[in-house]
């Protein structure tokens, strides 16, 4: 498992490397180029379930120490980890379906108690102090 310090620094270095490639590109304003070096936000999603990373709290603390906001997206399947998650800038729960059967079909969950886990995570949102968001997935019934 990679340590959070290495992940944060690696992500920042990769970001800087990409921004440097824009130097001298026609249409890129110098002030915008410089602004690109000041990372302000980090979205933790689309790379698996971020709250399953054992060092997620340290990772987000490192971001916050650097003045970087943290946007974390969870699939609402890990209520115990959600209880121990320290505040992030904004916490999203993906709502991929509105019924147990639809959620099973859409997400193909690994745990038999997926619906109970899902509803438990939703209930926990009411106890959290940071901004929270339901991220809805809309689609036709199949």
Ranges and model annotations:
Residues 1:
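Local cysteine-cluster metal-coordination motifs and their immediate loop/turn environment
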